[in-house]
Regions:
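Mobile-element integrase/transposase regions
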Residues: 1-33, 44-45, 188-199
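Acidic/histidine-rich, metal-coordinating catalytic segments
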Residues: 59-86, 110
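Acidic, His- and aromatic-enriched active-site or binding-groove loops in soluble protein domains
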Residues: 87-103, 127-138
Length: 218
């Protein structure tokens, strides 16, 4: 599973450039792929992308490999060799997600993102396919995000048609999905500061001054 930025495709939603990425899941043998649109590589986005892919596939692989994004891993310390030697461990939320589906975690080594080569290669291939389908469509403008996402689904469906033979070999050794999907969003209560700001996942957001010192749900 990997988050790949798609903003370079210059897709617009109601005339505005849509800055977004795709949480992209790929099976390494068949190259079967699926993904969901997100606007940051957060744990919620990874949860949405992974769960949607598992539900679409209908089966659960043994392992899930990811890079060292902050959605899945956190820094544990710095090794003697310096910056590239930083070690990372999995976040609690990511491990809980995998445990829910009976998956094992595997990540690339810090400084070696090319170890996630299968999905990285498919990222480029999918972007090229989307570019071609946008040209055939004659427009990069969409009325809504879900309309654009449906367009992406159709592109991935088409690419997956030629992968069915190898896919059958992969799912033959997998277990069916039996777990109920987890919620893809998390509600949290926070108090508005005297400066009319709230802190959510280490980021500050401005809210109306009428909410100062009040507790709000985000």
């Amino acid at each position: 599973v990997d988050g790949t930025w798609m903003t370079e495709l210059k897709v617009t939603i109601q005339g505005e450039l849509f800055k977004h990425l795709l949480i992209h899941c790929v099976l390494p043998y068949s190259n079967w792929e699926w993904g969901r649109v997100a606007q940051s590589e957060s744990l919620s986005a990874v949860r949405l992308g992974l769960q949607s892919s598992l539900c679409k596939l209908g089966y659960v692989p043994e392992w899930v490999q990811t890079d060292n994004s902050s959605a899945a891993t956190r820094r544990l310390g710095v090794a003697e060799e310096g910056e590239e030697g930083k070690t990372r461990g999995y976040t609690v939320g990511y491990l809980q997600l995998l445990e829910h589906y009976g998956l094992k975690a595997q990540s690339t080594h810090v400084g070696n993102p090319n170890e996630n080569g299968d999905v990285e290669s498919q990222n480029g291939g999918l972007k090229q396919a989307v570019k071609q389908h946008l040209l055939l469509r004659g427009s990069r403008e969409f009325a809504r995000i879900d309309e654009y996402e449906a367009f992406l689904f159709a592109v991935m469906e088409k690419r997956n048609r030629s992968r069915q033979e190898r896919l059958a070999e992969e799912i033959a050794v997998m277990k069916p999905v039996t777990a109920t999907p987890l919620a893809t969003s998390i509600e949290k209560k926070v108090r508005v500061s005297s400066g009319s700001l709230i802190q959510v996942q280490r980021r500050s957001y401005s809210v109306p001054t009428s909410l100062i010192k009040k507790e709000v749900t985000v």
